């Protein structure tokens, strides 16, 4: 699932940590984060984030279990725009979207 948050006002890694994600690594400007849903580490949300100006581009999926097939490219993940992924996307958007300025 992919979406974008516009006009972020804080560091992307800080925002995602606040949302419960743990930084894993950065590769060519793309950061990898995970948020386990169980103490064993799986299932977990696996998120890739990249900044473009003031915008944060997010791509994530749900890993159901660890890779069990060596160097194969198959993946035990869910990518649909419904169910648990949609709920997590909505949760992330509510946390990451900057609040509009207030007039006093």
Regions found by a protein language model. Name each.
Residues 9, 27, 39, 51, ...:
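A generic structural signal for solvent-exposed, polar alpha-helical segments
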Residues 50-81:
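Intrinsically disordered, low-complexity regulatory segments enriched in Ser/Thr/Pro
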Residues 1-39:
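Negatively charged, low-complexity tracts enriched in Asp/Glu with abundant Ser/Thr
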Residues 19, 49-50, 95:
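Generic structural signal for bulky hydrophobic/aromatic residues embedded
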Residues 41-46:
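Short, surface-exposed coil-to-beta transition loops
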Residues 73-104:
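A conserved amphipathic terminal alpha-helix motif
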């Amino acid at each position: 699932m992919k979406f974008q948050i516009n006009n972020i006002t804080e560091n992307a890694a800080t925002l995602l940590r606040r949302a419960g994600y743990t930084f894993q690594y950065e590769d060519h400007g793309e950061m990898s984060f995970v948020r386990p849903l169980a103490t064993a580490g799986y299932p977990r949300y696996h998120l890739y984030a990249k900044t473009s100006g003031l915008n944060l581009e997010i791509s994530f999926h749900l890993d159901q279990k660890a890779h069990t097939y060596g160097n194969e490219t198959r993946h035990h993940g869910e990518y649909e725009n419904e169910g648990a992924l949609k709920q997590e996307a909505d949760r992330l958007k509510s946390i990451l979207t900057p609040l509009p300025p207030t007039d006093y």
